[in-house]
Amino acid sequence: MRALIVDDSSFVREYLRHLLDRMGIACEEAVDGSDALAVLTDEKEFDLMLLDVNMPVMNGLECVKALREAKMHPEMKVMMVTTEADNSFITRALDNGADEFLMKPFTPESLREKMMLLGFAA
């Protein structure tokens, strides 16, 4: 299994990589939505993208919308990593193509639970 971690915070990227490495998941990283789309056009296959919402250049909502509109990696699951939990945001993210949410701050257990909801054994 392969995951793409997209977050402008190096701390969050390193923490997610550490947790996913412990689950046996290979990871690559991107610093914003634009960088993520560039990685995804390199013909690499990913099963999961963990996508921060608030980033410079291209935010997570713009990225997931562009990804789904371009029909890039249609089988890849997108988990939004966010501090925003209001219903209007969740509706907007789901409408743009997100599959699940991981609320910051998160624990290893909450990440595992969300992975299982997406159908990944964690």
Show which residues each predicted segment covers.
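Charged docking surfaces used in two-component/phosphorelay signaling
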Residues: 14-22
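Receiver (REC) domain active-site loop signature in two-component systems and cognate sites
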Residues: 55-58
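C-terminal output helix
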Residues: 106-115
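Acidic, metal-coordinating helix/loop segments flanking the phosphotransfer/catalytic sites
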Residues: 29-48
